[in-house]
Amino acid sequence: MVPLEAGRQTIRFNVTHEGWNINYFTISVPVEIPSYEEVSMVNRWKNQYLTDDGSGVLKYAGNIDSDNIDAYSWDFIPDEDGYYTIQNQATGNYIVNDGSGFAACMAESGEGDSGKWILRNVSGYTKVTSLLDDTLSLALENQDSQNRVELAEAPDSWYSAHFTLNSTRFDYDIYPDKIVDGPYTMTADNGKELHSTYENNTWKLTKDISELPQFTAENMPISEALYNMALQESLEDIFTETSIHTGEKVEVFNTGANWNKVWTRDTAMSVQYSLAWAFPEQSGNSLLQKIQGDPQEWVEDTGTGGSYPASTDRIILAMAAWETYLATGDTEFLEKVYDVTKYTLEKDFHVNYDPNTGLFKGETSGLDHRSKTYPDWMDEGYFSDIMESKSCNTNIEYAVAFKVMEQASEILGKDPAETEKWAKHFEALKQAINDTFWMEEHGYYSSWQYPEYMGNVLAEKTDVIAAGYAVYFDIATPEMAEKLMENYPLVKYGADTVYPQKTGKNFSAIYHNRGVWPGWEAALMEAAMVGGNHELAGEIMKSIMYGAARNLSNEEVINYETGAGNDAHRQLWSVAGQLAGYYRVLFGMTYDLDGIHFAPYVPDWMVGPFELSNYSYRDATLNLKVSGQGDQVASLKVNGEEKGANYVLPADASGNYTVEIAMEDSGEHSAVNLKPENLVICPELPEMQLEDGVLSWTPDTRYTYKLWTGTEYIDVTGQDSYTIPQNVYGSYSLVAVDEDGIASELSEPIVWNPDGTVLKYEAEDASYNSDCFANSIQGYSGTGYVQDNRPNGGTDITFKVNVPVEGDYLVSALYNNGGDTTSGNYAAIRSVLLDGEDYGTMSFSITFDNAFYRSPRMRMHLTEGEHTITFTYNYNGNIYDQNMNISRNNLAMDQLILEDISTMSVVESPVQLGLDGPETVETNS
C-alpha cells in the first residue's frame, strides 16, 4: 500500500527482470465528497433565493432579508454514497419530497430516500434532483402566488432548475495557496496554474511574460498566479491598429474580450492605475488614438443620448496622459496632450459649464447606462435630464484636468499667467465640488445633482469612482477624506459601485446596480493608500483577487451578493486594477515629478517575502523586495545601503537598483464600513398625480415621505396629498424613506408654472430658411417644425420674444433628433444668441424617432420688452457646436418655451469659476 496525497504524483518503475513489460496500471484514490455549509441557493432564471419561512413548504424570494439571513442559508451534508440532506440554518428543517408536487420543509429528513438529493453539474450550475424519484428536481418554472418551489420533471435546459450555491458567510478565507468561500475553492500550487471549483476549470499561463515585471511569492503561490494572470490578460488585450496621426501601425489596448476597440474612460482609468507604469508605449499610443478634429480635442465615446455632451467625461484622458508623462518623462507627448486638453476645456466651458453653480454638466463618469444608474423617468426616449444634471465624479475629473494643466504648463514653460489661471480653476472647482456634493450626514459625496429646473437637489446616493478620485486627487479635505474612507459602503465581494441600490425596470441587471466593478473600486483602493486607510486598501485588494480567482479572469462586473462574474473576460480596467494592487499596495509605489515614492502595505493575510524584478522606470531597472507585514516601513535599503522610509528613487535614475523594504505594524488601524446592511436596496420609486392644483399619491405604510418642492423638503408622512401654492414656480417630487433612513430616488417631477408665466413660440413662425420647413415627424405643435441639418445645409432659427416681466427664465425647446439613443454619437449642439450676442450652448440628445421632446433648460435673465433668441451653428468662426460624429448634427425644432422662475429661489453654489468666457487658443493641430 502506498499512500497518495492530493495533487500530481510521480511514480517511477525500475524494471530489473528481462522480458517484463508494463502495459497499464490502475490507481484508485478515494474521492472526498464535499459538504457545503452556510450556503444560499440562487436560481439562474430569475435570480430568486430558496428560503424556509416556517410554513412547511420550501419557498422562493427575490432577495435575501438581511435581518433573517439564516432563513436563506442551507447546509448540504453528504452520506457515504454521495447523496445529500439539505438543512435550513434558521429552522433546522430539511427539504423533503413528500409526494405533494412541491418541496416540503420538515423537522426530520424524511423516511427512506425522501429527504435525500442528488447534486448534478449542468452548464456550471447545480441541479437538485430527488433520490426518491430521480425524474423530479427543484424548479421555479411555474411560479404561483404562494412562492412555492415545485418538484418538476425539469429537462437540463430549464434555467428554472439551475441553482448557484453561494456562501452566506459575510467573508471568505485566503490562504497562501487557495481561497475558500463556502462551496468554492480556488487553488494555486504555483504561479502558472489556478483551479476554481466554481466552474470546475483551470487557468494556465500560456504566454511569454518574461520581458515584463516579474512577481515572485514563494510562500504565497496564489498571489503569484493572479499577478501572472493579469500580465497575460494585459498581453491578450493588446492589438495593432493604424495611428490616426502617423498612419503607422501601433500597439494599443482594447477594452476586453468583448470590446475590440480603444475606449475613452476604460483606457484612461486603466492607464492611470498601472498600465502607464507597466506598458508606457501602448498606454501613450492608446491615448493618442482618442483625439479627433481640427482643432484637436479628446473623444467622447458613443453612448447615452448621442455621446457628448450628454456624456462629458472625456476629460478623464488628461489624468491618464499625466500618469503616462510621469512614467516616461516625454515632454513631446506632454506638449501634444496639453494642446488637446486646452482646447477641450475651452470648448467645454462654452458647451457644458454652468456658471450658476460653478459646475460642469453631464452624466456620471462610467455610470453611463441610464436607468441602471438614474431614475427610470430619466430614460424615456430622450435624455435631457441626464444632460442637465451635474455629476460629482465627472466634475472631479475636470478639476484633475485643471491641476494637470497647471503642472504641465509650468514644465512646458508656458506664460506664468496661464499657469496661474489653471491653478485658480482647480481651486474654485474643488471648492464648488465640496460645497455642493459633500453630504456631511452620510460622510461621503452625493453621486450627482438633479437638473436646475428641479432646484439642483442632490441624489441621496454615492458612487465609488467619486469617492476614490476625491481622496486620491486631493479634492476632499483631510477631514472629509478620513470620514469618506471610514464610511464608504463595502460588501463581502468589494466596494459597492453605487449605494444604495435602485429598483426599477433594470433591477434584474447586475451592472452598476448590485455590482462590484474591480476596475472602479481600484480607484478607492489607490485612494486609501495615499489617504492612510490601509485596511480599506487591503479589503479592496482582496476582493479584486477573489473575483479573478473564482472566475479565472479579471471580469468587468462581480455580482455583489454572490461573487459570480458577468462573463466580460479580461476587462482592461479590471486587469489594471489587479496590477495596481501589487504595484500600489503591496509595493507601495506612487509616481511623482521627483520620482518613485515607496510606502508598502502588507495585509496580515499576505505571506511574504515578495519580489518584483525586471521592473522598468525610464532609464532604470528595479528589483524590489518586500518582507514582513504591516503598514510601516521598518527599513529601506537601496543597493544594500540604508536609506530610510522617505527615500525617493530619482526621476533621472539610470542603471540597476535593488530596493529592499522591511515592514512592521504601526499599531494604528482605521475603520472600514463592511457589513451585510450595505447590500440595501432603496424603496421603490414613488408616483404622484396632479389634478386641480393638488398632488396626490398612495402611501406605503413601510415608509415615511418627504416632498421636494424645488427649494426645500416638506415632511408629508401620514398624508396622501398636497395643495400646491398657486403663485409660486415649483418642481415637485416625492421621496420614500425606509426605517433605516434609506431614501428612494426622486419621483418624476411635476412642474407647476403660475398662470401667465409660460411663453411659447412656434418654430415655423420664427425667422429661418424657408426650405427647412418640415412636417413629416408626427406630434408637432402648430403647422410644422424647422429641420436644421448640419454641418451641410441647415439654417439659423431666430425667435422674437416679448417678455412681460423682467426676471430669470428657463429657456428650452420641443425638438426631435431621432436615432440610436444608447450608442450613437450625434447629439445636436447649437450656440444660443441673445439679441445677437453669444449666450452659451443648448444641447439636444438623440431621441426616439417619431415624437418631440423637451430639451435641457438654459437659465437666462431677460429684461422687459422684445428680444431675439437665435439658435446657430459654430457662431463667429468657432466650432464649439461640432459633435463627436462631426458629419451628422441634426435638429428638428418645433417650439421655443420660456418659463418665468422669478418666484422660485434657485439653489446656487456660492463658488463660481469667474470666467468672462472661453478663450480662443492656438493649438498645434
Explain the meaning of each model-derived region:
Residues 692-700:
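Conserved aromatic anchor
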Residues 182, 217-260, 284-308, 353-390, ...:
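Extended glycan-interaction surfaces of carbohydrate-active proteins
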Residues 167-260, 331-333, 344-347, 409-411, ...:
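Acidic/polar, glycine-enriched structural segments that form the non-catalytic walls/loops
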Residues 526-692:
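Non-catalytic C-terminal accessory modules of carbohydrate-active enzymes
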Residues 687-690, 919-925:
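Short, solvent-exposed loop/linker segments at the N-terminal edge
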Residues 1-33, 727-729, 735, 747-907:
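Extracytoplasmic
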Residues 186, 260-267, 271-366, 391-399, ...:
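Aromatic-rich carbohydrate-recognition surfaces in CAZymes
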Residues 33-170:
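Lectin-like carbohydrate-binding module/patch detector with strong preference for beta-trefoil
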